[in-house]
Amino acid sequence: MHRSPLAWLRLLLAAVLGAFLLGGPLHAAETAAPRSPAWAQAVDPSINLYRMSPTLYRSALPNAQSVALLQRLQVKTVVSFIKDDDRAWLGQAPVRVVSLPTHADRVDDAEVLSVLRQLQAAEREGPVLMHCKHGNNRTGLFAAMYRIVVQGWDKQAALEEMQRGGFGDEDDMRDASAYVRGADVDGLRLAMANGECSPSRFALCHVREWMAQALDRP
């Protein structure tokens, strides 16, 4: 049967389109990486609330409507990395508030160790929520360093959770990612274990300690 060039062109286009429609979803399914069960699990996407462990949650800035949920989760302490007063949304809820305003683009090792220690201390009293404004950059940084220093994850595993865990766009976590990539993991773990303020002997916190000791000498 004779077909015109236009008919052959239509058949070719139909074949290409069919292959695309059949192969596209299959290819996407093959290339989409499954979400690790070890990553923080979603609790309330409206405030980017995730459960990292039975005693540690992370989120964006909550609101007054979040209080009932946090009470059901038995959160005892809220740790904030922004300047806003958490009492504005917590009201009179029986939750301890810890304010630790930070900047992900200029955080240092001493600040990270201080936050990790305060998180651990608060966890001993019950579940803790840490948050910043959007729940990805500052919160992502401290969540990743908690995974690495406290829980023993390696950098790559913590970075994968940070960037692919559903907390926000990867571009919004550039500062956090940069700190994690450059972190002296062994030094931070050793300083954490030894109760030191920083892995660097020349850190400002150590200089302050030396000055205080010098002033205390008779």
Curated annotation (Swiss-Prot):
Its main location: periplasm. This is Dual specificity protein phosphatase TpbA. It comes from the Bacteria. Induction: Expression is regulated by the Las-QS system. Probably negatively regulates indirectly its own expression. Monomer in solution. Residues 44-188 form the Tyrosine-protein phosphatase domain. The keyword Mitochondrion does not apply. Disruption phenotype: Inactivation of the gene alters expression of diverse loci. Inactivation of the gene increases cellular c-di-GMP concentrations, increases biofilm formation, EPS production, attachment and pellicle formation, and causes cell aggregation. It also abolishes swarming, decreases swimming motility by 40%, and affects colony morphology, converting white smooth wild-type colonies to red, wrinkly colonies. Mutation reduces extracellular DNA (eDNA) and decreases cell lysis. The tpbA-tpbB double mutation restores eDNA to that of the wild-type level. Mutant forms flat and thick biofilms. It is found in: Periplasm. The keyword 4Fe-4S does not apply. Changing D105A: 53% decrease in catalytic efficiency with pNPP as substrate. Disulfide bonds: none annotated. GO terms for molecular function: phosphoprotein phosphatase activity. Belongs to the protein-tyrosine phosphatase family. InterPro entries: Prot-tyrosine_phosphatase-like, Siw14-like, Tyr_Pase_AS, Tyr_Pase_dom. GO terms for cellular component: periplasmic space. Keywords: Hydrolase, Periplasm, Protein phosphatase, Signal. The phosphatase activity is completely inhibited by trisodium orthovanadate, a tyrosine phosphatase specific inhibitor. Adopts a canonical dual specific tyrosine phosphatase (DUSP) fold, similar to eukaryotic DUSPs. In the absence of ligand, the protein phosphatase loop is disordered and the general acid loop adopts an open conformation, placing the catalytic aspartate, Asp-105, more than 11 angstroms away from the active site. Ligand binding reduces the conformational dynamics that occur on multiple timescales in the loops at the active site. Residues 1-28 form the signal peptide. Phosphatase that regulates diverse phenotypes in P.aeruginosa via regulation of the concentration of cellular c-di-GMP. Acts by dephosphorylating the membrane-anchored diguanylate cyclase TpbB at tyrosine and serine/threonine sites, leading to inactivation of TpbB and reduced c-di-GMP production. The reduced cellular c-di-GMP concentration leads to reduced adhesin expression, reduced extracellular polysaccharide (EPS) production, pellicule production, cell aggregation and biofilm formation, and enhanced swimming and swarming. It affects colony morphology and controls rugose colony formation. It catalyses: O-phospho-L-tyrosyl-[protein] + H2O = L-tyrosyl-[protein] + phosphate; O-phospho-L-threonyl-[protein] + H2O = L-threonyl-[protein] + phosphate; O-phospho-L-seryl-[protein] + H2O = L-seryl-[protein] + phosphate.
